[in-house]
Each structure stands twice: as structure tokens, then as C-alpha cells.
């Protein structure tokens, strides 16, 4: 049983836009969530801006909630989302313990191998893992 659960809403793109990325208000309502339940805190990134890790206004509110695990949207070549290195920078900046990729196996023409994402993480830092499509994990005992 989960007992009580709390969900915090955080921005995935700067709330005032990003002129360098040609993102103007109001096209900034992209959200992420930090969900806390049963002593575990999970960050679901939503569709973050490619330069998420460079925006303290995005990183710090998530980091302040001290999530344990992050489900991070990323892509190796599509500039809408953080590239693999940007995803690593997100995880490090937030202070995550474990990370899993999101949006792989979602789009036929934009698919990627999540093992390539995993390989980008340094030995010191968040531990990456892949949740196979249409499956699940039990955290933290499943890692």
C-alpha cells in the first residue's frame, strides 16, 4: 500500500519562455512532477526544454524536493528534448540517485537505443537503468 501520496508540479520549460530556443509565452506550460509516496520520491520530467540543465529556475525547484529516482525524457538527436549529455547534466544537477529514460520506444521514426543513453552516465553519480517496455520495476529492491 502506498499510504498517502503527494504530487508536486514543476516546470519543464522556463515559465517566461526562452528567446534563444524561440520559445515565447504562453508556449511554456510544459510540466513535470515530483511524486512522493511510501518514502520514495520520483521525478517525472515531462517534456523538458533541451537546455533544462542550464536553467537554475528549472533545476533548483526539482532538486529542493530531493527526488530519489528520475524518469527523464531525452533524445540523442531531436533538439526539442535534452540530448543524452544534457540528460546526464539534468540528473547530476538535480541530485538523482537512479535514472531511467523516458520516450524511448514511443515513436517509430524517432526511436533510439536506451543503452546508448545509459553509456553516457559517469561511474560516479546517478545509476542509470532501463525499464523494459510494457514492464515494471519495484523500487528500490528491483535495482
Predicted regions and their residues:
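Loop/turn elements at helix/coil->beta-strand transitions in domains of secreted/extracellular proteins
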Residues: 5, 39-41, 66-70, 95-97, ...
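Short, solvent-exposed loop/turn segments at secondary-structure boundaries
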Residues: 19-23, 82, 111-112
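Active-site neighborhood of phospho(di)ester-bond hydrolases with catalytic His/Asp-centered motifs
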Residues: 43-50, 69-76, 99-104, 130-133
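Core dinuclear metal-dependent hydrolase active-site scaffold
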Residues: 1-60, 64, 136-143
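A short, flexible beta-alpha/helix-coil linker loop
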Residues: 14-15, 77, 105-106
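Generic structural signal for short, solvent-exposed loop/turn connectors between secondary structure elements
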Residues: 77-79, 85-86
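Binuclear metal-ion centers of metallo-dependent hydrolases, dominated by the metallo-beta-lactamase
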Residues: 1, 56, 61-63, 84-143
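Short, solvent-exposed loop/turn segments at secondary-structure junctions
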Residues: 52, 79-80, 108
